[in-house]
Amino acid sequence: MATIHLTKGGFENRIAKIDEMATQWRFLGTRPALIDFYASWCGPCQRLSPIIDELAEEYDGKVDIYKVDVDAEEELARLFRVRSIPTLVYIPMGELPIVELGGKGKGEIKEKLNALIK
């Protein structure tokens, strides 16, 4: 499955209700997730994008992988306090999200995805 580009509406249907996030985290997904916060003009984001797309295929049915354009979805970026891009947000089942700054290599991202599905 290809990566899914999230808008505010998609986020509220698949990830969490924005108005509830200030008081509690309640993940709506049925599998762990990864969200890649990016911008089209960002060089490191452009280098990371094909890796994220490959991982979406590799982890299809195990981890849902999303992308959020920070320029188009500023509110979503603010929710996770995205200050630099790329930023990756790992969402385990039943736990709080893990926010990591900067581009990572495929191997490092795979390690973290594998930890999500254990």
Label the predicted regions.
Residues 30-33, 37-41, 84:
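Short pre-active-site segment immediately N-terminal to redox-active cysteine/selenocysteine motifs
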Residues 43-46:
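Cys/His/Pro-rich metal-binding microdomains
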Residues 11, 37-38, 91:
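Conserved hydrophobic/aromatic "anchor" residues
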Residues 6-33:
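A short beta-strand-turn-helix
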Residues 1-12, 114, 118:
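N-terminal targeting signals for export/organelle localization
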Residues 5, 37, 49-56, 60-75:
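Thiol-based oxidoreductase modules, predominantly thioredoxin-like and allied folds used
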